[in-house]
Amino acid sequence: DEGCLPDWSSYKGHCYKVFKVEKTWADAEKFCKELVNGGHLMSVNSREEGEFISKLALEKMRIVLVWIGLSHFWRICPLRWTDGARLDYRALSDEPICFVAESFHNKWIQWTCNRKKSFVCKYRV
């Protein structure tokens, strides 16, 4: 897609790639940061962006749960995206730790950070 690396998909000035390999949340974030300059686990800033990535994960890769860049490791700190984006759009479940995006219903689900899941990297074009 325009401005993105090969095999990446573009949406509103950002590039995305779903990785089927499973990693812990921290390892997935490290992978995204090392893969491309400005890369992070994806932030989701609107319902439409969430639907876009759900389609990529579910329809193209047959993946239901993917790590996203939202975490609440210390619980005394506010929730934050790994890329520094503001948390203007929320689709939270009850008890935040790390989060996966669930592709069928476009919802975020708390998940144990040390479990291994597929993930989505995102960077600005």
Curated annotation (Swiss-Prot):
The main location class comes to secreted
Gene3D superfamilies under this entry?
Mannose-Binding Protein A, subunit A
Q: In the record, what terms sit under GO molecular function?
A: toxin activity
State its location(s): Secreted
Please provide the record's keywords in A-Z order. Answer: Disulfide bond, Hemostasis impairing toxin, Platelet aggregation activating toxin, Secreted, Toxin
What PROSITE patterns does this protein's entry cite? C_TYPE_LECTIN_2 (PS50041)
Disulfide bonds, which pairs? C4-C15, C32-C121, C98-C113
Q: Which InterPro entries match?
A: C-type_lectin-like, C-type_lectin-like/link_sf, C-type_lectin/snaclec_domain, CTDL_fold
* Organism superkingdom: Eukaryota
Q: In which tissues is it expressed?
A: Expressed by the venom gland.
User: Which Pfam families does the record cross-reference, listed alphabetically?
Assistant: Lectin_C (PF00059)
Q: What does this protein do?
A: Snaclec that binds to von Willebrand factor (VWF) and induces its interaction with GPIbalpha (GP1BA) (via the vWF A1 domain), resulting in platelet aggregation.
Which family would the database say this protein is a member of? Answer: Belongs to the snaclec family.
How is the quaternary structure described?
Answer: Heterodimer of subunits alpha and beta; disulfide-linked.
Output this protein's name. Answer: Snaclec bitiscetin subunit beta
